[in-house]
């Protein structure tokens, strides 16, 4: 290809779609996979190790993750993951479960005790990252596409709420002292605080929008 043809091809690839793709609550629910119901697996690890000294290594190249003994640095278990995981998995407060987010929207919950992926759901088309509430009740996915936040039941990964952001969401994190999620907006001069300790009467989480400067 000539340089001009390369530029034209790049421009074509990067142009926005005429109709924004839809990935709403209906599509999210339809993608939900439960491999093991809550409470159906043993409450003790199937391997011997110091449970307070473990590592999860995310392998980007071949889409696997490895549970590593933090004392000996020997692999305990290596398992396949979704395509192109983000490198920052999140953990349940008790350390038993690890949550992964893939760049194409899949959220996976892995039971470290039983070395098994127990649930998965596709929360978006282009996902930036994932956070888990300090109390272990909620998980939340920050999406570029669609431009929203998706709140999940951390136990089952069932979708609870979709929050339209009107912006790409750069990142979301949990703020334990505030019992809140904090979300950064890409296209708005705002940071959102989403308290998770005081849901509304219908169970939904409310939003506090905080204006920011350049």
Name these PLM-found stretches:
Residues 1-214:
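Predominantly soluble domains enriched in secretory-pathway, periplasmic, or organellar proteins
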């Amino acid at each position: 290809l000539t340089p001009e043809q390369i530029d034209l091809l790049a421009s074509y690839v990067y142009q926005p779609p005429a109709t924004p793709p839809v990935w709403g609550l209906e599509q999210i629910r339809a993608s939900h996979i439960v491999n093991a119901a809550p409470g159906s697996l043993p409450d003790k690890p199937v391997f011997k190790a110091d449970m307070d000294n473990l590592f999860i290594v995310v392998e980007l190249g071949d889409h696997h993750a490895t549970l590593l003994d933090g004392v000996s640095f020997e692999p305990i278990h290596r398992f396949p993951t979704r395509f192109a995981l983000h490198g920052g998995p999140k953990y349940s407060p008790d350390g038993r479960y690890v949550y992964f987010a893939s760049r194409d929207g899949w959220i996976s919950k892995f039971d470290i005790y039983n070395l098994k992926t127990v649930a998965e759901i596709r929360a978006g088309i282009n996902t930036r990252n994932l956070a888990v509430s300090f109390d272990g009740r909620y998980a939340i996915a920050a999406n570029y596409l669609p431009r929203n936040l998706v709140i999940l039941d951390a136990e089952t990964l069932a979708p609870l709420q979709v929050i339209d952001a009107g912006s790409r969401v750069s990142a979301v994190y949990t703020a334990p002292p505030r019992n809140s999620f904090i979300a950064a907006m890409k296209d708005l001069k705002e940071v959102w605080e989403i308290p998770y300790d005081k849901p509304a009467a219908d169970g939904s989480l409310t939003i506090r929008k905080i204006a920011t400067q350049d």
